[in-house]
Amino acid sequence: CLDTGHIQLVHRQPADYIRKAGSRLKLLHMHENDAYGDLHQMPYTFGSSKECGTDWDSLASALADIGFDGTLSFETFPCMNSFPYGTRDEVLRTIHEVGVYIKGKIDVLSEQFVQNSVKNK
């Protein structure tokens, strides 16, 4: 299990740790922070600069590279408190759609990785 936000707290990017874990990685806790506080915000909240946010494209690429087929767990409950109570269902839908988007990127990159591997044989 790796935690994207906790990796950010030591000013690193999760992609390196994902590749090191390889096939042993079965669960990824996904959330965003500002690299200074463990804020548990939804992915992309702070952009994708290496100084402040998670590089989500590199993360998706690393997951594709290792053939990840585990669980993506979104630890984003604290971000719910940032929105008015009446909008929470929509916020949950947005978090879900972000998850679908990231999973789609992983799937596309995985397919490209397989195709390139076949071509290079």
Model regions and ranges:
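Histidine-acidic metal/acid-base catalytic patches
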Residues: 1-121
